[in-house]
């Protein structure tokens, strides 16, 4: 055993305890503020008791005993079923075997595949304890090779150690494999009319390796230094790597932990590489000569013209039909297309040479949006950008633009519709994602 695992376990449990106590103390203060007199005295006794219970629960041996008892609620896997469908109840698979000289990219080509954990989301704290690396080792790796010294150093007696080992080793138990009606299934034909029924599983380990590689290229310190050198026309001794036309698949919605532990660590984000054939794209020119990209026959008009025409035709076709769920969904579909086309254009403009907006006629909010890297050298610009007020102005301009572009003698759009466009969920989400990525780069 490498040095430090017992200390890591102690630190892990203590950090969880402190987080629980901090949250408890914060809520307790709120409760005290609403009480006085006898009611406050009674509440103080109850609060003191509840706080002691948290401390007792997080006493190291108590916590490890509880964690060992909950370990059976999770499984360590490389291929997880719930990526296929969050309600699927079948088996996930652990297969970390590697293949040398492979001709295709797969989990087997990973030298050290990340091990995922699936099962009861309430027990993922146990998975994190087992999986977290400390000084090049982890508790799960130690247990796999039969090295029990980390737990032995913390156990009160051999009986308690045996109880912990029995509990934690449940994560390695091979349960009876089963599929589920929500799993993907493929009929693979054989001779004589027979077939194999295959159930492909999503490789969480491969997805995590891809996420780590791409995140390092997009947000790593070295990648930031390379991009800074590019923007200032300086030499750099490393290659500039990019993955164009990336797509992001969000797994698990607002509860990524219900899919798996690694999925939760990625906030549900999985990157998809583009498999589309290359296309010739003209280099975008900075919109310097006008006050808005939302002007008539402007840049946004050009990039969204086909979708705008389709949306207007659809709205005219259902003008006399009573509003229903299908109409609302189709209208939202067109709106989402427009938003994606807008942000695709914005992303291309943001990658133009830094500072182009300083000589432009653009409204200030659009300068702040479209030329974000100017904040690296312009302090006033940076402060305005960090204030964030410009985002509301941009959303307002987008809503006004869409009202104007959909206008027709048989279609009436007003403030209600403008507000709907400006506050669209996808618009907010794309803005949030774009700003989050930029914040990492500008940090």
Curated annotation (Swiss-Prot):
The keyword ATP-binding does not apply. Keywords: Antiviral defense, Coiled coil. InterPro entries: CRISPR-assoc_prot_Csy1. Residues 15-64 form a coiled coil. Induction: Expressed in late exponential phase (other phases not tested); part of a large cas-CRISPR3 polycistronic operon. One of its GO terms (biological process) is defense response to virus. If the spacer DNA has a perfect match in the chromosome then toxicity results. Suppression of the toxic effects occurs via mutations in the CRISPR/Cas machinery, or via target deletion, which might contribute to genome plasticity. This CRISPR/Cas system can be used to remove genomic islands, and possibly other genomic regions. Belongs to the CRISPR-associated Csy1 family. Interacts directly with Cys2; part of the probable Csy ribonucleoprotein complex with cys1, cys2, csy3, cas6f and crRNA. CRISPR (clustered regularly interspaced short palindromic repeat) is an adaptive immune system that provides protection against mobile genetic elements (viruses, transposable elements and conjugative plasmids). CRISPR clusters contain sequences complementary to antecedent mobile elements and target invading nucleic acids. CRISPR clusters are transcribed and processed into CRISPR RNA (crRNA). This is CRISPR-associated protein Csy1. It comes from Pectobacterium atrosepticum (strain SCRI 1043 / ATCC BAA-672).
């Amino acid at each position: 055993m490498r040095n430090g695992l017992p200390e890591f376990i102690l630190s892990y449990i203590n950090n969880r305890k402190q987080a629980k106590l901090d949250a408890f103390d914060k809520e307790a203060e709120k409760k005290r503020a609403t009480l006085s007199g006898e009611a406050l005295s009674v509440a103080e006794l109850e609060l003191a008791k509840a706080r002691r219970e948290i401390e007792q629960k997080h006493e190291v041996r108590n916590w490890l005993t509880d964690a060992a008892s909950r370990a059976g609620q999770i499984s360590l896997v490389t291929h997880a079923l719930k990526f296929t469908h969050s309600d699927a109840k079948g088996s996930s698979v652990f297969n970390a075997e590697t293949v040398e000289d492979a001709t295709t990219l797969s989990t087997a080509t990973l030298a050290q595949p990340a091990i995922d954990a699936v099962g009861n989301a309430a027990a993922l704290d146990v998975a994190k304890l087992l999986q977290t690396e400390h000084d090049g080792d982890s508790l799960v790796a130690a247990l796999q090779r039969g090295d029990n010294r980390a737990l032995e150093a913390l156990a009160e007696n051999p009986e308690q150690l045996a109880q912990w080992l029995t509990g934690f080793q449940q994560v390695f138990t091979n349960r009876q494999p089963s599929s589920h009606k929500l799993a993907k299934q493929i009929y693979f034909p054989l001779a004589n009319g027979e077939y194999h029924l295959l159930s492909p599983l999503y490789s969480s380990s491969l997805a995590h390796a891809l996420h780590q590689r791409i995140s390092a290229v997009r947000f790593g310190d070295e990648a930031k230094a390379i991009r800074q050198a590019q923007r200032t026309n300086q030499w750099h001794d490393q290659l500039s790597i990019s993955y164009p036309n990336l797509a992001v698949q969000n797994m698990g919605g607002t509860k990524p932990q219900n899919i798996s532990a690694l999925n939760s660590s990625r906030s549900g984000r999985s990157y998809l590489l583009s498999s589309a054939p290359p296309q010739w794209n003209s280099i975008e020119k900075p919109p310097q000569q006008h006050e808005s990209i939302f002007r008539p026959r402007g840049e946004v008009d050009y990039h969204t013209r086909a979708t705008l025409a389709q949306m207007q035709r659809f709205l005219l076709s259902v003008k006399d039909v009573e509003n229903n769920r299908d109409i609302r969904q189709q209208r939202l579909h067109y709106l989402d297309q427009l938003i994606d086309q807008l942000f695709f254009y914005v992303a291309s403009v943001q990658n133009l040479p830094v500072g182009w907006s300083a000589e432009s006629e653009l409204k200030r909010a659009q300068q702040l949006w479209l030329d974000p890297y100017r904040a690296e050298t312009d302090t006033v610009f940076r402060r305005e950008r960090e204030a964030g007020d410009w985002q509301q102005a941009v959303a307002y301009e987008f809503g006004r633009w869409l009202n104007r572009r959909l206008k027709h003698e048989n279609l009436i759009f007003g403030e209600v519709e403008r507000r709907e466009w400006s506050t669209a969920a996808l618009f907010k989400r794309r803005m949030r994602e774009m700003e989050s990525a930029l914040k990492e780069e500008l940090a």
